[in-house]
Amino acid sequence: MLLIISFTIVSFFFIIIFSLFHLLFLQKLRYCNCEICHAYLTSSWKKDFINLSDWYTHLLRRSPTSTIKVHVLNSVITANPSNVEHILKTNFHNYPKGKQFSVILGDLLGRGIFNSDGDTWRFQRKLASLELGSVSVRVFAHEIVKTEIETRLLPILTSFSDNPGSVLDLQDVFRRFSFDTISKLSFGFDPDCLRLPFPISEFAVAFDTASLLSAKRALAPFPLLWKTKRLLRIGSEKKLQESINVINRLAGDLIKQRRLTGLMGKNDLISRFMAVVAEDDDEYLRDIVVSFLLAGRDTVAAGLTGFFWLLTRHPEVENRIREELDRVMGTGFDSVTARCDEMREMDYLHASLYESMRLFPPVQFDSKFALNDDVLSDGTFVNSGTRVTYHAYAMGRMDRIWGPDYEEFKPERWLDNEGKFRPENPVKYPVFQAGARVCIGKEMAIMEMKSIAVAIIRRFETRVASPETTETLRFAPGLTATVNGGLPVMIQERS
């Protein structure tokens, strides 16, 4: 016993010494004292910018090529559409997610679609495309959203409206709503998060913690630190593993339960994936479905939070949306949810959602890793193993891309002369990625966002309650754009 303890202590000190050696010597090989690296390491950028993404936007605007290098992160960051096309389309095979990315998110996402490459990625993408594109799944998803709106969302909003002065965190509502709906779609499981008095879901909390701590891994300038903490099971890495254990336990229970009850007549994704995934590979099944759960929950909520924040600052846009809803659905509140055919006629609402995601994309940036040495379209040299990031948040704020009115919330930029929605080239607007990795859940996400927007805008007036939130949005670290402090609003039902 004494020998084991002694060995553990020696191992611990060896790791500490090795970590310090790594920090003090090896990191110097890629560290320089340039303005960008110094500002990143010392966080001096915080003196002038609220969000890291705003600082990156400033740097990318200042760069003649809209591309910068952050040497301490071994990273190239770009807001140049020609580079985005090169990364996502022209030279796609040289920019996989990469082993480095898989290590960062592997504990949470395993071999899921958002953390895989090659045959594993192709298999899941083909499978997911078939399922999400099927009429039965789309009808099932719309019915889930419709039921959640009618039985949970609207009663809660009415309850707060009946209590003047009460404050509701809309971001929390959207996260609860989307977690309920994506859980039902993915697992056939209802966590029942969107009900008063807003219960704490063990599953949802575990997801929040795991995604936050995984994102912090990706931002770490010295990866060996979090790897050492993971090895020793201490600090944030211990907390991350505990959260992932909760996810694994609950997901495992749901998979076992579904295998016992059978798949016949089930439209949820786990039932459909079970039909093609080997019976002895529940871990792979868990990875597939958890990836969809993570993407479907956080991105929709993030997109809606930015959208409603912008509406409170632009009542003229909200009024035009209401005019369109009255034209398509009729006046009055007889219809609280929109049919799919009605939503297809809502071009101005569609344009407003796209415009809000231009300014506040749910995923602010996305990274790949270069397999081989390469040269980007703007002439930037990329070494093998370099992390290459295209920054959707910055791209939405570039006058070179959107013109001198880039700061304006202007849905009209998405409409043609007849008022019909006109999409932009995805390499200019990579909110849903582009090329082979374009988001396969885009249509379903837009359906959910439109459904919620219609239900709220027709029935209620919202006003931001916090002076700080009124002026700007401060984002918390995470895989998606979560607003620090939420979106506190006061609700009033329209007459």
UniProtKB/Swiss-Prot annotation:
Cofactor(s) required for function per UniProt: heme
Phenotype upon gene inactivation: No visible phenotype under normal growth conditions, but mutant plants accumulate high amounts of 12COOH-JA-Ile in response to wounding.
Transmembrane segments: 2-22
Root EC class: oxidoreductase
Binding site for heme: C439
Keywords of this entry: Endoplasmic reticulum, Heme, Iron, Jasmonic acid signaling pathway, Membrane, Metal-binding, Monooxygenase, Oxidoreductase, Transmembrane, Transmembrane helix
InterPro entries the record matches: Cyt_P450 (IPR001128), Cyt_P450_E_grp-I (IPR002401), Cyt_P450_sf (IPR036396)
Reaction(s) this enzyme catalyzes, per UniProt: a 12-hydroxyjasmonyl-L-alpha-amino acid + 2 reduced [NADPH--hemoprotein reductase] + 2 O2 = a 12-hydroxy-12-oxojasmonyl-L-alpha-amino acid + 2 oxidized [NADPH--hemoprotein reductase] + 3 H2O + 3 H(+)
Function: Involved in the oxidation of the plant hormone jasmonoyl-L-isoleucine (JA-Ile), a bioactive phytohormone of the jasmonate-mediated signaling pathway. Converts 12-hydroxy-JA-Ile (12OH-JA-Ile) to the carboxy-derivative 12COOH-JA-Ile. Exerts negative feedback control on JA-Ile levels and plays a role in attenuation of jasmonate responses. Also functions as in-chain fatty acids hydroxylase in vitro. Catalyzes the hydroxylation of 12-hydroxy-jasmonoyl-L-phenylalanine (12OH-JA-Phe) in vitro. Converts 12OH-JA-Phe to the carboxy-derivative 12COOH-JA-Phe.
Protein's name according to its UniProt entry: Cytochrome P450 94C1
